[in-house]
Amino acid sequence: MKWLLLLGLVALSECIIYKVPLVRKKSLRRNLSEHGLLKDFLKKHNLNPASKYFPQAEAPTLIDEQPLENYLDVEYFGTIGIGTPAQDFTVIFDTGSSNLWVPSVYCSSLACTNHNLFNPQDSSTYQSTSGTLSITYGTGSMTGILGYDTVQVGGISDTNQIFGLSETEPGSFLYYAPFDGILGLAYPSISSSGATPVFDNIWDQGLVSQDLFSVYLSADDQSGSVVIFGGIDSSYYTGSLNWVPVSVEGYWQISVDSITMNGEAIACAEGCQAIVDTGTSLLTGPTSPIANIQSDIGASENSDGEMVVSCSAISSLPDIVFTINGIQYPVPPSAYILQSQGSCTSGFQGMDVPTESGELWILGDVFIRQYFTVFDRANNQVGLAPVA
């Protein structure tokens, strides 16, 4: 059987690729809403997506300013194993951050009681360190320690991987989070405490034959989505991949030519920057143009603070077109209007960027569901093609 599998892999390609299935679940927002907690949560937390990318305050070297509320709408999750024998965790594969962290048995917070906890004493390969980790959000921080262990990711045994073990997770809202931790896939330059990101460690050990990974997010309610390490599977897209240079090697940041609706520029008229982020669900941009888009599509705020649209209007709404490196990438209303349990909400979100970097957009899952995306570290570029 093993020989048959090996022959099949060789016949398929000279490159062996590893696929991590992603499962689509209810987002933290939906869980809070169903428990009657969303309105109170939104009232207490002034959500600003920009804080994930541009912390407002400088922090010590060991502090990772990564607000956890930014994962409020994420719906795609995968399973990894840490330790020997492996202890399983549900994580967000996040191209908008670079650290790996999971809850640990040292955590006494309410949020940890509803999640899988890593126990170093149950792993024969765990190595402790004196390093610490603190991820800030809202009114508190997730604090923890750093350690090394073997991480199992889609059939890859990533040995000697540094990761964070949470000790406190303030904020009872995390109790309802459908994920245990975060696996960051951005560049090492934004990694907290100089920790080597998972994909960098995998590549450095020669565990994949190509220095890239790719993502397919299915619109299906549950299955089909995947992260592919070390290769590209053309069955997930149509046509050819179009390549876009990374403009800043930190996040997966690219240049956008324009953003139009009905042939008219609605934002980014003179070009702008965008971050391709699997850890953000929505299409996020500056407050002013987003407010105009919300008005144009007839979105209004409901009692929970969500921007809702009449479901019957979807068929009459226009595409939003992102022109990137000379190629047009339309996002249809069926993609940017999110339908759930008979209600329709806008897939756009405003943010205030406290930097001098100009107009910045976040191309989250609303965009990635439309376009198979390759994150090419070898050539510092992003590949995009319409999903099959």
Swiss-Prot record:
PROSITE patterns: ASP_PROTEASE (PS00141), PEPTIDASE_A1 (PS51767)
Keywords annotated in UniProt: Aspartyl protease, Digestion, Disulfide bond, Hydrolase, Phosphoprotein, Protease, Secreted, Signal, Zymogen
GO biological process: one example: proteolysis
Signal peptide: 1-15
EC number per UniProt: 3.4.23.1
Chemical reaction(s) catalysed: Preferential cleavage: hydrophobic, preferably aromatic, residues in P1 and P1' positions. Cleaves 1-Phe-|-Val-2, 4-Gln-|-His-5, 13-Glu-|-Ala-14, 14-Ala-|-Leu-15, 15-Leu-|-Tyr-16, 16-Tyr-|-Leu-17, 23-Gly-|-Phe-24, 24-Phe-|-Phe-25 and 25-Phe-|-Tyr-26 bonds in the B chain of insulin
Protein name, per record: Pepsin A-1
Chain's gene name: PGA
